[in-house]
């Protein structure tokens, strides 16, 4: 309860979104942010080993205690469907929960897509605000029985935070982000159409935490790519 907890669930994009959110919070709030996820656990700039996307309940609580003692005010974490189904995050009062997408995966554990989606939807009974990718129709499944206030992001008319004038390039994406009458431009050095969704979710989380749209876009534009996620490798002698 003494930490601002941000949880991100979905089949793909969790690692990228959590890393981008950590960067934006550090740049805009000057906060010390803990990170829990697939690639690494991190307290500020200190890297800790990781065994699974979301630790077991006892280990998770110990890690959160360690982050609090180290001066963290915010924690952004990947929340896997296994963790939700096995109640590893029960009792954690998430300030914000976010949904990236839902595609076929982990059916050895969940057996059906319905059970898989229902497991991920549990996050939105544990958070105050839900930031959801409205470009994936499964966002409606996430909101069934939800206890949170939803904030939809995407490229369609249903999105409260919407990407317009999207430009896709080999080494970046650029877009105008509109929220009602407000608009801001962002250029992010991670290529791929999915980067649009990841960027919007990051900005939606920032907005849910009270960070201004322009400030969030400016901070996001300074983010580097995520290790092992669509890293651009220059080839000498070729454009």
What is the predicted function of each stretch?
Residues 1-134, 138-149, 179-182, 206-209, ...:
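Phosphate-binding loop of NTP-binding sites
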Residues 110-117, 144, 148-239:
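Adenine nucleotide phosphate-binding catalytic loops in nucleotide-utilizing enzymes
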